[in-house]
Amino acid sequence: MNLKLRAKRVEKGLTQEEIAKELNISVATYNRYEKGHTEMTETTINKLLTLLECKYEDIFLY
């Protein structure tokens, strides 16, 4: 599970539905990203980082 991704989303006050809409993906797909069941494309990662106003290291490096 990507706890950092979920934590950052919650910190920004966004729902999975809002993130999915902004990324133009289904809520189920976004949920799989947060659970670590599906890998994101580079384009999706970049959109997500912009949306969450953070750096790659903030979410994906441990």
What are these regions (language model features)?
Residues 3-22:
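Short basic helix-loop element that most often maps to the first helix and adjoining turn
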Residues 5, 16, 27, 42-45:
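Helix-turn-helix DNA-binding elements, focusing on the entry/boundary residues of the two helices
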Residues 17, 27-31, 57:
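Key DNA-contact positions within bacterial/archaeal DNA-binding proteins
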Residues 25-39:
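Recognition helix of helix-turn-helix/homeodomain-like DNA-binding domains
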Residues 43-58:
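DNA major-groove recognition helix of helix-turn-helix/homeodomain DNA-binding modules
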Residues 61:
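Phosphate-coordinating loops and pocket residues in cytosolic domains that bind phosphorylated ligands
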